[in-house]
């Protein structure tokens, strides 16, 4: 099936499949049925089969799924079988936390540069990489291969830097700034708003309290 016809919902479930299959491998599980995977992921078995059929199925009638094979194949679909050079713009608390998250490198996301506007941070080492000034970014992009840029900047600076990134050929931006970035069709932007997830949790907590107050 043409990848363009695969829904965003399916794509967003793939990392969950990958994560759960990785956990199964660590537990020594060699094969699993769609029903067993359904119970673990809280997704219907039918949905799992439909999702995986978009990419060829991978299962065998009466056998289920070979966990290691499926884990490897989903990793390939997600592009985790290649190295993705990555930079972080913003060396504050969030930027440094992301830089220090070692699992990114295990998945092929290799940090090659960190930048910030604050001269106080210039030269400090984060995971062995010295923080550079944002003014050095255009030259760095010309001299180094970079696929992904992570933005953890204030929103007024993020828009400006996104423009520079795009002008210098960056095609993938992971944006943590408090602004949704607009970009050309050939540039992929993943906007992440951490506070929205927390507000969703707050709503669910409020509803839970209302429900239990009514029952008392």
Labelled PLM ranges:
Residues 121-124:
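A glycine-biased structural micro-motif
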Residues 1-30:
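Extreme N-terminal segment that seeds HTH/winged-HTH DNA-binding domains in transcriptional regulators
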Residues 22-25, 129-216:
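Phosphate-bearing ligand-interacting subdomains
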Residues 31, 35, 40-83:
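HTH-adjacent hinge/linker in prokaryotic transcriptional regulators
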Residues 79-118:
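Glycine-rich adenosine-cofactor-binding loop
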Residues 76, 100, 163:
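Short, well-ordered alpha-helices that flank and scaffold nucleotide-derived cofactor binding pockets
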């Amino acid at each position: 099936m043409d990848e363009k016809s695969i829904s965003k919902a399916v794509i967003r479930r793939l990392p969950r499949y990958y994560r759960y299959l990785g956990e199964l491998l660590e537990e020594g599980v060699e094969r699993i049925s769609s029903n067993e995977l359904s119970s673990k992921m809280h997704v219907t078995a039918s949905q799992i089969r439909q999702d995986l059929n978009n990419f060829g199925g991978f299962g065998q009638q009466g056998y289920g799924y070979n966990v290691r094979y499926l884990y490897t194949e989903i990793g390939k679909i997600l592009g985790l079988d290649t190295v993705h050079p990555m930079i972080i713009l913003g060396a504050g608390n969030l930027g440094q936390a992301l830089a220090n998250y070692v699992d990114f490198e295990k998945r092929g996301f290799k940090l090659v540069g960190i930048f910030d506007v604050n001269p106080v941070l210039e030269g400090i080492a984060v995971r062995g990489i010295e923080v550079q000034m944002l003014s050095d970014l255009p030259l760095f992009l010309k001299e180094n291969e970079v696929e992904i840029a992570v933005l953890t900047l204030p929103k007024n600076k993020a828009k400006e830097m996104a423009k520079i990134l795009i002008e210098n050929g960056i095609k993938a931006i992971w944006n943590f700034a408090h602004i949704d970035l607009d970009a050309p069709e050939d540039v992929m932007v993943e906007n992440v708003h951490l506070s929205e997830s927390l507000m969703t949790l707050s709503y669910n907590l409020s509803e839970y309290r209302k429900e239990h107050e009514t029952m008392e």
